[in-house]
Amino acid sequence: MVLADLGRKITSALRSLSNATIINEEVLNAMLKEVCTALLEADVNIKLVKQLRENVKSAIDLEEMASGLNKRKMIQHAVFKELVKLVDPGVKAWTPTKGKQNVIMFVGLQGSGKTTTCSKLAYYYQRKGWKTCLICADTFRAGAFDQLKQNATKARIPFYGSYTEMDPVIIASEGVEKFKNENFEIIIVDTSGRHKQEDSLFEEMLQVSNAIQPDNIVYVMDASIGQACEAQAKAFKDKVDVASVIVTKLDGHAKGGGALSAVAATKSPIIFIGTGEHIDDFEPFKTQPFISKLLGMGDIEGLIDKVNELKLDDNEALIEKLKHGQFTLRDMYEQFQNIMKMGPFSQILGMIPGFGTDFMSKGNEQESMARLKKLMTIMDSMNDQELDSTDGAKVFSKQPGRIQRVARGSGVSTRDVQELLTQYTKFAQMVKKMGGIKGLFKGGDMSKNVSQSQMAKLNQQMAKMMDPRVLHHMGGMAGLQSMMRQFQQGAAGNMKGMMGFNNM
């Protein structure tokens, strides 16, 4: 049972409260039994599960509750709160300082995904505008430097290592000195792992740590070992000053929940989680948003962060056009590019309320990305006049020969081109209506600039454009309106970013 299954089972248990006519002790106990069973199946320690059950029971006294209170919501809130506590170590995680040289040393057992995770962390900060680099001080595993070199080259991250020097302390020291002299902000050092916790591994870790004096030591933990993570994390903490933990392989193992709760029990803050093989299958770990996404409640704050990463604030020309209700094929092409930059579709969908982390399978995700690339390939075969025309699809309807030319140039059928134009027309019509809403593109809090009736019209337009299944997952019109309200408040008028979001 992977994490998505755990989320689905707990959500199903909580949903049973809505189906019950009367909320009594029997209904509460049945729901808690389902939640606890799901946690035990995910290899969460039985003591932690019992504690969660007792805490919820003590927080909810059905007999003492006033009749006007919403018992369902209070029970759901109590369960949510306890699930957050389950994965929260209660310790603030270390964060790098911008403009400073932050040395991060990675430790862990062999096979935990340490080298790949080094590259993922460097890439994560690089995308956020930090100057990052990688150092391979793993001289024990054959091919470690080749792997790091390959990952770094693919992501265009500077790296340092040696095929001849066998002393990891020398390599780490030289690499850190080199990158400090070049004013790198994030300096990541990968160290040797072993198949088990050998004394020689700990001794080597201490030597490297003493030589480079890292600002943060990150322990990389394999989620597949479940609650055994606790003993392993404690063993490393006793030997070196482990400040943070990254849990890997959470995408495909039944014991992910057990691993997360076990690490939290050691009071070690989890800073990131690995959710796949690709370099962007990597997410910051924040307890409340994590549980919120797990239960299909979304993470609007995380979504806004993703949008802001795109640096869409510079796109003043597009905003000016939107004010006047104009949207060209080139604009749509650029929005598709923004979506591609935001990372895996499943990661983005998990941030939208109503979608669980399992809504889009890996196969569906690849299919969606392939479709998006196909649409962009079609637009690559269009000329400037077609891409920049404010008449949009009318240019093609007036001269059907253009459709045949674009189809030939992009290697698709004329029907594919027509489908693209139909999709574009829907977007353009919505933008035209948005342009008529005064205050929508004004600075400040959008909820104050736009009237409720205007926002209702905009929501209706969005609902018409959406796949009915998607709208259903969001909780219908009420769910869409709730999400838009959250987005307004969180984005504080950042409508520029929302354009990248609306086109998903």
From Swiss-Prot:
It holds the Pfam family SRP54. Residues 1-295 are annotated as: NG-domain. One of its GO terms (biological process) is granulocyte differentiation. GTP binds at residues 108-115, 190-194, 248-251. The keyword Nucleus applies. SMART domains: AAA, SRP54, SRP54_N. GO terms for cellular component: cytoplasm; endoplasmic reticulum; nuclear speck; signal recognition particle, endoplasmic reticulum targeting. InterPro entries: AAA+_ATPase (IPR003593), P-loop_NTPase (IPR027417), Signal_recog_part_SRP54_M_sf (IPR036891), Signal_recog_particl_SRP54_hlx (IPR013822), Signal_recog_particle_SRP54_M (IPR004125), SRP54 (IPR022941), SRP54_euk (IPR006325), SRP54_GTPase_dom (IPR000897). One of its GO terms (molecular function) is 7S RNA binding. Keywords: Cytoplasm, Endoplasmic reticulum, GTP-binding, Hydrolase, Nucleotide-binding, Nucleus, Ribonucleoprotein, RNA-binding, Signal recognition particle. Residues 296-504 are annotated as: M-domain. It catalyses: GTP + H2O = GDP + phosphate + H(+). PROSITE patterns: SRP54. NCBIfam families: SRP54_euk. Belongs to the GTP-binding SRP family. SRP54 subfamily. Component of the signal recognition particle (SRP) complex, a ribonucleoprotein complex that mediates the cotranslational targeting of secretory and membrane proteins to the endoplasmic reticulum (ER). As part of the SRP complex, associates with the SRP receptor (SR) component SRPRA to target secretory proteins to the endoplasmic reticulum membrane. Binds to the signal sequence of presecretory proteins when they emerge from the ribosomes. Displays basal GTPase activity, and stimulates reciprocal GTPase activation of the SR subunit SRPRA. The NG domain, also named G domain, is a special guanosine triphosphatase (GTPase) domain, which binds GTP and forms a guanosine 5'-triphosphate (GTP)-dependent complex with a homologous NG domain in the SRP receptor subunit SRPRA. The two NG domains undergo cooperative rearrangements upon their assembly, which culminate in the reciprocal activation of the GTPase activity of one another. SRP receptor compaction upon binding with cargo-loaded SRP and GTPase rearrangement drive SRP-mediated cotranslational protein translocation into the ER. The M domain binds the 7SL RNA in presence of SRP19 and binds the signal sequence of presecretory proteins. Component of a signal recognition particle (SRP) complex that consists of a 7SL RNA molecule of 300 nucleotides and six protein subunits: SRP72, SRP68, SRP54, SRP19, SRP14 and SRP9. Interacts with RNPS1. Interacts with the SRP receptor subunit SRPRA. This is Signal recognition particle subunit SRP54. It comes from Mus musculus. The gene is Srp54.
